[in-house]
Design a protein with these regions (language model features):
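Contiguous, well-folded functional domains in the mature portion of proteins
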Residues: 1-153
């Protein structure tokens, strides 16, 4: 049975190989896809849980959710955003908490990240996944938060 991975944010789909960070583009942490978030309005938006499961790791700029079958999805909010020390992010959940797909996990402002000189792109990674098992949405397509971003066989 395949796992449907929802987009944590609304925006435009980007191939992981086009993410301007070698850790992600080189698939060092795993295969996946990315989304350039829609920063319209410049306000805070919620980054959603891409799957139902347990939050196994959470930081202000990133989180991992593991489902009951042991599949883990990493959502990383922007590049080099760890350098912000949590500024611009509001964590809404905690490690060990069970969440349903589509539940808000972190509020953040992609426009604020961008105005600070950082890239707000959001890599969504299948940790310990095989690229051949993933079917990501095609690049350059618009995706809404909560819509299917990729499937993991």
């Amino acid at each position: 049975m395949s796992l449907t991975v929802q987009s944590p944010v609304s925006g435009v789909v980007v191939a992981l190989s086009d993410v301007p960070d070698p850790v992600f583009s080189g698939k060092i942490v795993g295969p996946g896809v990315a989304v350039t978030p829609d920063a319209a309005g410049g306000g805070e938006v919620s980054a959603l849980a891409p799957i139902s499961g347990t939050i196994s790791k959470i930081h202000p700029h990133a989180y991992v959710i593991t489902n009951d079958d042991g599949h883990s999805i990493l959502v990383h909010l922007g590049l080099d955003t760890v350098s912000l020390g949590g500024s611009g992010f509001t964590v809404l959940a905690e490690e060990g908490q069970r969440v349903e797909a589509g539940s808000p996990v972190i509020n953040w402002s992609p426009a604020q990240i961008e105005s600070g000189g950082l890239n707000p792109i959001v890599p969504v990674i299948a940790l310990e996944g095989n690229e051949s098992d993933l079917e990501p949405m095609s690049p350059d397509r618009t995706v809404a938060a909560g819509e299917t971003l990729m499937t993991w066989a």
